[in-house]
A protein has these predicted regions:
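Interdomain motor-coupling "hinge/lid" segment immediately C-terminal to the ATP-binding subdomain
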Residues: 2-6, 127, 133-237, 243
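Conserved lysine of the Walker
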Residues: 52
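Accessory nucleic acid-recognition modules appended to NTPase machines
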Residues: 201-340
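A cross-kingdom feature that marks ATP-driven nucleic-acid transaction machinery
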Residues: 2-21, 64, 282-392
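Hydrophobic anchor at the beta1->P-loop junction of P-loop NTPases
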Residues: 44
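Pre-Walker A adenine-sensing motif
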Residues: 17-36
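Short glycine-rich substrate-engagement loop in P-loop NTPases that contacts/grips substrate
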Residues: 64-95
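Hydrophobic positions on the alpha1 helix immediately C-terminal to the Walker A/P-loop
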Residues: 55, 59
Length: 392
């Protein structure tokens, strides 16, 4: 690599790292990644716009003899990942932080060779597309981490400097500790709807909403989806029709059959498209607990895609759908509950407990263990819905 090119890499790395020095908040993965054993390379994948680049720069800032580089930089297009890493190692760098590694076609082969040579440690990020997770030949060399979209807690801390700490699901299940948590976070409990509307990403989605989010959706479809399957204009049109239909409907209303009828494609095509849309981070699928006679999932969006699509269509998102989707995006679920007839319900299994999601008038007609209600009430088996946004 020419000296002037690498000099530019150094200058850009220093400027980028300096740009995050003032950021006091960190994504939830930061401390875990700091403790990672250097015996392995580290990969972080996740949806666009949720803080992967800032996370990588913060790690570089706190690591000695480190260099940051964006793999999609145009001036580096003639150099492979191996070329860049080899030059960094030759100049005494011990840690290389590579952003957007999925934009390089031969990145897995380069990482394999670099790991086996053992001259430099690498941490890298990529989109949520499946090609970032595919590297089977890297399984002995790389520890992969998914960076989830920011939780309500992280949204409040990053945007409003709330200083909110994580809570455990077991603390919410205990009435005494739940009371203390609810009182402590009372002023933040009404923010879940703002978070639902535009808080699942960290770029400034609130300004000119929903345009920034719709632009992100377009890029995810045309770039990320194209990296996991072949697409053409017809498939892109089918994807948009599916997304619009899902956005306007409740998760309990959607099925593979009615989506196939609406779009005009086979059920198999719908199933494959839905799975691919989950891989690239647009959808979140929640399957029935213990299967049942049909294992068809509930179809949720990652936040804030449903609200953006609906607002672009001049529609309001149903509040019941918003509550469920907020819950599904913030809680590690074991699955949703079906009735004996196979009807989808707003009940979810979380750590062995049944939790029913609803509004202030929700009654315990399903005999759930707990009610996640859109209120501040924490008495008995009621848990304020917003508190489920503080789990990570």
């Amino acid at each position: 690599m020419e000296s002037q090119v690498f000099s530019k890499v150094i200058v850009e790395s220093e400027n980028k790292v300096k740009s995050v020095v003032g950021f006091k908040q960190h994504r939830y993965l930061y401390k875990e990644l700091q403790k990672t054993n250097n015996d392995f390379y580290v990969g972080v994948y996740g949806l666009r716009g949720i803080g992967k680049t800032v996370l990588l720069l913060q790690l570089a800032s706190s690591t000695k003899k480190s260099l940051y580089v964006s793999a999609d930089a145009v001036y580096l297009s003639n150099y492979s990942i191996y070329d860049i890493a080899e030059e960094a190692a030759n100049r005494g760098y011990k840690n290389l932080f590579i952003d957007e590694i999925h934009t390089r076609t031969n990145w897995t082969a380069d990482l394999k060779t670099l790991f086996d040579e053992g001259r430099i440690h690498i941490v890298f990020t990529g989109s949520s597309a499946a090609n970032v997770k595919r590297g089977a030949d890297l399984s002995r060399r790389v520890i992969m981490h998914e960076l989830l979209p920011p939780s309500l807690r992280e949204f409040l801390n990053i945007k409003l400097n709330a200083g909110a700490e994580k809570v455990s699901i077991h603390a919410l299940f205990n009435e005494s500790t739940r009371k203390n948590i609810a009182v402590k976070y009372t002023k933040w409990l009404t923010y879940w709807q703002d978070y639902y509307r535009y808080g699942g990403v960290l770029y400034d989605a609130k300004v000119s909403f929903p345009k920034p989010v719709m632009s992100a959706i377009e890029r995810i479809i045309n770039v990320d989806l194209a990296s996991v399957r072949q697409i053409d204009s017809a498939i892109v049109n089918d994807v948009y029709k599916m997304l619009y239909k899902i956005a306007k409907s409740g998760p309990y209303e959607m099925s593979y059959n009615n989506l196939a009828d609406y779009v005009g494609v086979s059920v198999k095509t719908v199933i494959n498209l839905v799975k691919d849309l989950e891989k690239v981070g647009l959808l979140k699928l929640v399957y029935p607990y213990k299967g049942g006679f049909r294992k068809e999932p509930k179809l949720y969006f990652r936040l804030p895609f449903r609200s953006a699509i609906n607002e672009s269509l001049g529609l309001a998102t149903d509040i019941g759908v918003a509550r469920e989707e907020f819950f599904a995006n913030n809680v590690p679920l074991s699955g949703y509950v079906k009735t004996e007839r196979g009807t989808k319900t707003p009940d979810f299994i979380v750590d062995g407990k049944t939790i029913e999601v609803g509004g202030t008038g929700k009654t315990n007609y399903q005999k759930a263990d707990f009610l996640a209600i859109d209120d501040t009430d924490f008495i008995g088996n009621k848990i304020p819905l917003a508190l489920f946004g503080f789990l990570y």
